[in-house]
Amino acid sequence: MAQFIDRRLNGKNKSAVNRQRFMRRYKEQIKESVADAVNRRSITNTETGEDVAIPHKDIKEPLFHQGKGGLRERVHPGNDQFITGDKIERPKGGQGGGGAGDGDASADGEGQDDFVFQISKDEYLDLLFEDLALPNLKKNQVNKITEWKKHRAGYQTAGMPSNISIVRSLQQSLARRTAMSAGKKRLLHELELELERIQNQEPAQKLEEMKLKQEIAELRKAIESVPFIDTFDLRFKNYERKPVPSSQAVMFCLMDVSGSMDQATKDIAKRFYVLLYLFLNRTYENVEVVFIRHHTQAKEVDEHEFFYSQETGGTIVSSALKLMDEIVKARYPVGEWNIYAAQASDGDNWADDSPRCKELLTNKLLPNCQYYAYIEITRRSHQTLWHEYEKLEESFDNFAMKNIRSVEDIFPVFRELFHKETA
């Protein structure tokens, strides 16, 4: 039974090349659809892809056609009703339009829905976080992390079975068999010609013929004894580890969980930080994340407790800033780490504590931070904390603050804060 082996590089995804070309061509429309999808689905839902809809008008291809008006003769196939000179009535079309339009239904009008297709989880996250980066990331020279990446470096005679190069091994086998048997094959050919000459000679020379046959048999046995492949022939792909220097960074996530933060505000803060957490883990391999929750007291927690703990209390923002400063001094020396922070709050704070927050940021944190982002989640007028932070924004280039009013503002604000700087 014949067997067909599919050696095409795309494997099961036979149309992968066409898909990639389509996504490159309509990248802007796809990115807009992905940005809209952020607000429709849970940010934590990253195990699945996303259905992307592109308006049909955006994917129309250019075409050549006759302009409107004018007189022209044309032969239409299948015409059995009209003759030259007849006037054709305009079709009665309804207002069928694209997708979910407000037009009336019509049996004759033709509408066109949006083009909808699904992108994978990786494609969704790639588009979501494209053009985003940690601002002001510097290559610190002290205790720089060194990543090792493997690169192909020829072949070697020993290695793991998974790294064996079949083609190169067979080439070595052919070369060895040719070298070991070429002389014997040449001698065998000469003896066979000699045997044929003796057999056709008169009178017969039986002793000489038997001697030649014995030599030929021994030569054939020697040629057949050459193994098809030997351990000497095996060649393995060789990989070398080359150092690739990279910067190490730590991101502090500070979130207010005081009693003034209602559940809707906490949900917005959680969504922002989940988005940030996914971005950091997907974009950078060497980024540590420190989670700090605070009310009247601040506490370093793990990821699960940061997002799902029900603990609450009053509001003293400076407690979180003090704890961050202590952690930086204890674990993240400024000369070795690029330090980033993102703080989320509803703006409520003990009035006497807001100047203290400004003082801590001015004297201790901002001089050591590459970037500090503050988001205030509120629809109300801003209070003392916002006004104190406005003074910081005027004095420090590495400090940014934004206001989030609703879920729809999360992704646009996130992109503004972490937009990749172009050279």
Curated annotation (Swiss-Prot):
Residues 81-111 are annotated as: Disordered. Residues 93-102 have a biased composition (Gly residues). InterPro entries: UPF0229. Disulfide bonds: none annotated. Pfam families: DUF444. HAMAP family: UPF0229 (MF_01232). Belongs to the UPF0229 family. This is UPF0229 protein VV2350. It comes from Vibrio vulnificus (strain YJ016).
